[in-house]
Amino acid sequence: MKSIVIAVTLVLFSFCFAFGETEAPTKDDAKALVKQAIAFVKQNGKEKFFDEVRNPNGKFHFKEGTKKGLYIFVYDEKGVVLAHGVRLELTGRNRWNDKDPDGKYWIRDWTDLVHKSGSGWIKYKEYNPADNNKIMNKWSYVELLDGMVIGCGIYE
């Protein structure tokens, strides 16, 4: 009887951990969010899109579940922030000359990428706002639409 109680307790305990954990967002999640953003801007226009990106309770912000931490960012082709889902203070700032801690011009890299192929993935280092602004590797999926570089990234 004692071993049955212990076994049941262990099973229940493992369920608590399983349901309490959330998986990190995936590259597929980030890419899907960019695709949703592109569909939204095509249907609603740039200004409504920018407002939705900046809205902390909008459809391009995930605060829980497996997509927790995902958000959209939008730049023009010269590195100016048009909308940012987390760092609203960046709006209007030109980040063309910003480098990551390794000296990589990541804005230039993703602009080159979207001009060559229309979309793709770039890896660089960036502050993670969901993890006390810790510098982490970040993979961002970016896509070009009407002079806008629309992206979403995941941290490693």
Where is each model-derived feature located?
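Bacterial N-terminal signal peptides
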Residues: 7-16
